[in-house]
């Protein structure tokens, strides 16, 4: 099965019922780089409602997959993010969604 990687960082934003969702797709080659990116984003967006993410990283011949809902209802955020990477056969990438809840909260 063919695998794909990201050539560069991508960003997108979605607004719904007063809430804002900002997504980042970032190429990463090590889990440590995911943690660095998350630390930077948590400092940059300290008032975010949630920072959910999923990653797939092929390191030393082993595929490492992880997802977290970061306080959202179980299975509602992290797993769907991870599934985007899986369905598209993307490795060495993390997708991070930063959410701010408005009137929907």
Where are these regions (language model features)?
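C-terminal regulatory domains involved in ligand/effector binding and gene-expression control
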Residues: 1-76
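Signal for well-folded cores of large energy- and translation-related assemblies
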Residues: 42, 85-90
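Well-ordered alpha/beta subsegment
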Residues: 104-105
